[in-house]
Amino acid sequence: MLSVILKSSVRGLGKAGEIAKVRPGYARYLLADGKAVRATKDNVALLEQKLALIEEENSKKLAEAEGVAKSLGAERLIIVRQSSDDGKLFGSVTVRDVSKLLCDLGYDIQPRCVSFSEVIKRTGEYEINVELHADLVAALQLHVVRNESEAERVRLGIAKSEDQAAAAAEVEQAEDVAAAEQQDSSPVDDHADDADGATGGEGRDEGAGDASDGEEMPST
């Protein structure tokens, strides 16, 4: 096992600035990819000096990844593949296919960052995972269809669902505003109620007194 200092966070291994022990083959990959340096005495000393800078850089990369995740969530991921009438694909959809789709949409996502929970060998809707950062994995919906006509129907269906969700949100917001305005326009004044009750009580007492004064004493 070799000790390396991680220059950036690696999922399942550690965060930027940490020292990790890995097999020689994996160490060569990390070194070549610029994700780590050898944990020599000099590098460890240098790490201690630059640790704050490394953590700041990692936070910056995480913020960028969160922005990419939000943007990806708005994309409609559709792959067209030939299939039989029952939906069985002539082949399968691979992580490379998804990586190419994302790259075509303007995202630099390598195949190693894509994963599926199941092998995609039929048309349908699937959840895929895209690792954008060691601390952030985006779960996306992938639609696999047999032709462009079906792809267009999927696009229209997604758009309709989004419109319905937006309309429902607007209605809910309007109802909340109306309820708040109604509550503001009819305040409950507890002091006024107490005052009215006290006045009413005094009126009743005075009336009772007047009635008593007006009664005649029975003659004997």
From Swiss-Prot:
GO terms for molecular function: rRNA binding; structural constituent of ribosome. Residues 167-220 are annotated as: Disordered. The keyword Ribosomal protein applies. GO terms for biological process: translation. Transmembrane segments: none annotated. Disulfide bonds: none annotated. Pfam families: Ribosomal_L9_C, Ribosomal_L9_N. Keywords: Ribonucleoprotein, Ribosomal protein, RNA-binding, rRNA-binding. Residues 167-184 have a biased composition (Low complexity). InterPro entries: Ribosomal_bL9 (IPR000244), Ribosomal_bL9/RNase_H1_N (IPR009027), Ribosomal_bL9_bac/chp (IPR020594), Ribosomal_bL9_C (IPR020069), Ribosomal_bL9_C_sf (IPR036791), Ribosomal_bL9_N (IPR020070), Ribosomal_bL9_N_sf (IPR036935). GO terms for cellular component: ribonucleoprotein complex; ribosome. Gene3D superfamilies: Ribosomal protein L9, C-terminal domain (3.10.430.100), Ribosomal protein L9, N-terminal domain (3.40.5.10). Binds to the 23S rRNA. NCBIfam families: L9 (TIGR00158). Belongs to the bacterial ribosomal protein bL9 family. This is Large ribosomal subunit protein bL9. It comes from Anaplasma marginale (strain St. Maries).
